[in-house]
């Protein structure tokens, strides 16, 4: 027999709750079965009581699900939990991080609009703007991420959107989000921040003045390399446009992946703190090694934006990049000599990963575009996982010995 639960009942009143409580409980609704964990709704469609009920739901006259391309209870719980953690009015989940960017730009920009995108972004993001959005008549320029004067100078009367990663992939470059938001708003534009590297556990861009936050949930939100997904979170009328695009175009998140991400969120802050602590220790160790030319990690006092990172983030994240002496051949020898870390381009996993950005994530860019993004042949990116730090250092020492 089922228990006497109110279907759709919210888990509890969480107004004013702290981050860790929201990460565990926000958005959860129990079914009449009274389950304690989040229910997984693997259904494509929903049954209506009558023809009139179906018509009313499709017309939006009464609440309720009609089709999982539009809404799904498991996905909705994930969306509401992300919105609570980011301080957003609404969040909408997508099939991948790239589809989140697609939904954002296709929803908010039209042919003839102008978009400013940082040079310091993921290689596929550059390809999306350069190869595809330009086909639709959207103009794109790429100012340097941290040069606020360059952003202001690059604005045009038709500038609609600023898009940045902060910290950037893979060089951990930052922008003063509050200052950039002021410039964008003065020019009548919106600011979107890809918060993938920090997650809301370490940085909340909306509270700093950004209008929209983007995530690849595939990374630290999942945390264990299991599922793919993305999120757009924001405030105001722009989110209605994003929801409308996603319901029509269809790059929606699978319920199973939403359920995985809910499990990941429960340990998000704990994991990000552990990732950050190990990454900082590894960056400090690498900086002392003779085979390393430069380390890119905002937690290091030597990083040119260390103080900015301390001001707008509560931690420095898991990604440590560094240049080895000797160019591409040396970088490949370093990578191939490791025995524990995984050679893969994904990040955000409990397992440490290592990659050569110039020939993987940024490999499809022209040499000129890679140079503008600061991606050299000697660069290695390590996304620090949750293994023992001494074991990780020992594996990096194998790489150093191969130089």
From Swiss-Prot:
Pfam annotation, one family: Cys_Met_Meta_PP
Provide any one GO MF term from the record: pyridoxal phosphate binding
GO cellular component terms, A-Z = cytoplasm
| GO biological process terms held by the UniProt record | 'de novo' L-methionine biosynthetic process; homocysteine biosynthetic process; methionine biosynthetic process; transsulfuration
Q: Which reaction does it catalyse?
A: O-succinyl-L-homoserine + hydrogen sulfide = L-homocysteine + succinate
InterPro entries, per database record:
Cys/Met-Metab_PyrdxlP-dep_enz, Cys_met_metab_PP, O-succ-hSer_sulfhydrylase, PyrdxlP-dep_Trfase, PyrdxlP-dep_Trfase_major, PyrdxlP-dep_Trfase_small
Q: What is its EC number?
A: 2.5.1.-
Q: What class of enzyme is it?
A: transferase
| Keyword tags | Amino-acid biosynthesis, Methionine biosynthesis, Pyridoxal phosphate, Transferase
HAMAP family assigned: MetZ
Membership in a protein family: Belongs to the trans-sulfuration enzymes family. MetZ subfamily.
- Quaternary organization: Homotetramer.
Give a short account of what the protein does.
Catalyzes the formation of L-homocysteine from O-succinyl-L-homoserine (OSHS) and hydrogen sulfide. Cannot use the other activated form of L-homoserine, O-acetyl-L-homoserine, as a substrate.
Protein name per UniProt: O-succinylhomoserine sulfhydrylase
> Whose protein is this, by species?
Pseudomonas aeruginosa (strain ATCC 15692 / DSM 22644 / CIP 104116 / JCM 14847 / LMG 12228 / 1C / PRS 101 / PAO1)
**Phylogenetic lineage:** Bacteria, Pseudomonadati, Pseudomonadota, Gammaproteobacteria, Pseudomonadales
Gene name on record?
Answer: metZ
């Amino acid at each position: 027999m089922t228990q006497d639960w109110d279907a759709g009942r919210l888990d509890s009143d969480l107004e004013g709750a702290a981050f860790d409580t929201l990460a565990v409980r926000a958005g959860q609704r129990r079914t009449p079965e009274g389950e304690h964990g989040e229910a997984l709704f693997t259904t494509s469609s929903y049954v209506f009581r009558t023809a009139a009920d179906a018509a009313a739901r499709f017309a939006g006259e009464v609440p309720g699900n009609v089709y999982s391309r539009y809404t799904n209870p498991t996905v909705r719980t994930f969306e509401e939990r992300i919105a609570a953690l980011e301080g957003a009015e609404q969040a909408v989940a997508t099939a991948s991080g790239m589809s989140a960017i697609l939904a954002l730009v296709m929803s908010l920009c039209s042919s003839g609009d102008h978009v400013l995108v940082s040079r310091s972004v993921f290689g596929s993001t550059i390809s999306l703007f350069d190869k595809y959005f330009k086909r639709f008549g959207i103009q794109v320029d790429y100012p340097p991420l941290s040069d606020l004067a360059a952003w202001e100078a690059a604005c045009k009367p038709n500038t609609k959107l600023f898009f940045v990663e902060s910290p950037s992939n893979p060089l951990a470059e930052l922008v003063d989000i509050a200052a950039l938001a002021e410039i964008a708003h003065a020019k009548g534009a919106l600011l979107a921040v890809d918060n993938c590297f920090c997650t809301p556990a370490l940085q909340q861009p909306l509270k700093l003045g950004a209008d929209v936050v983007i995530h690849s949930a595939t990374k630290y939100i999942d945390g264990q390399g299991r599922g793919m997904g993305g999120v757009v979170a924001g405030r105001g009328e722009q989110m209605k446009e994003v929801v409308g695009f996603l319901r029509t175009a269809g790059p929606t998140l699978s319920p199973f992946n939403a359920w995985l991400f809910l499990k990941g969120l429960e340990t998000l802050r704990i994991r990000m703190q552990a990732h950050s602590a190990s990454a900082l220790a590894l960056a400090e160790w690498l900086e002392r090694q003779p085979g390393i030319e430069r380390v890119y990690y905002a937690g290091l006092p030597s990083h040119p934006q260390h103080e900015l990172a301390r001001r707008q983030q509560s931690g420095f994240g898991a990604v440590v990049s560094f240049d080895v002496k000797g160019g591409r051949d040396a970088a490949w020898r370093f990578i191939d000599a490791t025995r524990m870390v995984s050679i893969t381009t994904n990040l955000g996993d409990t397992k440490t990963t290592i990659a050569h950005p110039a020939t993987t994530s940024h490999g499809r860019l022209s040499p000129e575009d890679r140079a503008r993004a600061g991606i050299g042949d000697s660069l290695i990116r390590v996304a620090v996982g949750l293994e023992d730090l001494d074991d990780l250092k020992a594996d990096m020492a194998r790489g150093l010995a191969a130089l």
